[in-house]
């Protein structure tokens, strides 16, 4: 039985007795358990490496790797253009000041869930405190403006419960198409500049140029 536990279960003498058969069954079950546990641990490690622990959406590394991949694909195969949305929750500091960090965390989770649902098959991630980026490759027959407007309205419609309160928020965004630039760094920088313009221009809007 000890040899079986050490991996000799496939080399058994004949005839077999009940003790040996039981030991083989136990060894087989143990092997299946450890294989399943190994797969679970690998999934957990992958999840930790690719997602934001608070919101469950992709983290900064995944988002920027995807941007690089999209640019590489476009250069190699003349892939259709894609867009980047750089987004920021309006007045988030005031939310933290009013409701504390637990309230702010609830807002971040609610916005992340809304963006994930609104963006569907597209990549969306949290890249900073209250900052999010979406990479739009598929708009499902919408114009880019219609797509962004649906995101903006989805966030406005949120009424986030926290303790005895309902927190209402808006979001601002800067938008850029891949056809406007030649490299990844410029791509992100211009989107951030447009986000800043959206903030300066009154918030609760997306800027496209």
Language model features with spans:
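Alpha4 helix (beta4-alpha4-beta5 surface) of REC/receiver domains from two-component response regulators
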Residues: 1-10
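Catalytic-core segments of nucleotide cyclases and related cyclic-nucleotide turnover enzymes
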Residues: 145, 163, 176-209
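Hydrophobic framework residues that shape the active-site pocket
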Residues: 88, 92, 111, 127, ...
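Active-site-proximal alpha-helical element of nucleotidyl cyclase-like catalytic domains
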Residues: 103-123, 131, 150
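A Lys-centered signature of the CheY-like receiver
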Residues: 14, 126, 199
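A short pre-motif secondary-structure segment
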Residues: 123-126, 167
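Conserved nucleotide-binding and Mg2+-coordinating catalytic segments in signaling enzymes
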Residues: 46-65, 87-101, 109
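Short regulatory alpha-helical coupling segments
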Residues: 46-47, 58-80, 112-119, 137
